[in-house]
Design a protein with these regions (language model features):
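Polybasic, low-complexity binding patches
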Residues: 74-82, 93-128
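C-terminal, charged low-complexity interaction regions
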Residues: 132-195
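Pocket-edge structural micro-motifs
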Residues: 88, 122, 131
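Histidine-centered nuclease catalytic patch
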Residues: 53-86, 90-92, 96, 101
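Residues that form generic nucleotide/phosphate-binding pockets
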Residues: 15-19, 37, 41, 87, ...
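Short, charged surface segments at domain edges that flank catalytic/cofactor-binding sites
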Residues: 2-50, 74-79
Length: 195
């Protein structure tokens, strides 16, 4: 899970909201072009074509707009640009796993850096809390569970990535899929190559 550095709200979205007084997100279905434009903008300008939750590469067709704070629980934030990111469409993890679940302990990737809370298990590919007790542990645990970040296929993909790259860590590119896993591997190179 990576930090999303939001840009200022794009002018096209500001103008759309001025022109159309929508009262909920479902009304955006009549304006699919703006939803697509928002996804394109976020993917290219803020997320480097990756889901911020699972870090898998996505594109406009394999993604959906995600409300960090669920629109059903926070109806006044349904078009707050800082509450919108683009997530993968996986049916078992990320935004679809989260649905309308909410906890004040959920790590908001726009407001907080998930790397302060999360780490990796190099043997299993699973995401783990960085701390073993306290508030940071609780935030990590809640977020991992809500997003199902240890979905079997996802953990296996991370494990295979670690195994496939453990002897070429010096050549990993920082962008693209699994960017925080790559940073973790670089920072823990000695322990990874000894496994």
């Amino acid at each position: 899970m990576f930090k999303v550095n939001k840009t200022p709200e794009p002018k096209f979205f500001q103008e759309f909201k001025k022109k159309h007084s929508l009262s909920n997100w479902n009304q955006y279905d009549s304006y699919r072009y703006i939803k697509q434009q928002l996804r394109e903008y976020s993917l290219f300008e803020e997320q480097e074509l990756c889901c911020p939750y699972c870090e898998i590469e996505i594109d406009v067709d394999t993604s959906e707009t995600e409300h960090i704070k669920p629109k059903d629980i926070f109806p006044n934030e349904f078009q707050d640009f800082n509450n919108l990111i683009v997530a993968c469409k996986s049916s078992k993890r990320c935004g679809n796993s989260k649905g309308s679940q909410w906890s004040p302990d959920f790590i908001n990737p726009v407001l907080e850096n998930p790397q302060n809370f999360l780490t990796y298990d190099i043997k299993t590919g699973e995401v783990r809390p960085k701390n073993s007790i306290g508030t940071d542990y609780e935030k990590a645990k809640v977020t991992i569970d809500i997003l199902n970040l240890n979905d079997k296929r996802l953990a296996e993909a991370r494990k295979n990535f670690i195994l496939g790259n453990k002897y070429s860590i010096d050549y990993l590119e920082p962008e693209g899929e699994f960017r925080t896993l790559k940073e973790f591997m670089i920072d823990n190179k000695d322990s990874i190559t000894s496994v």
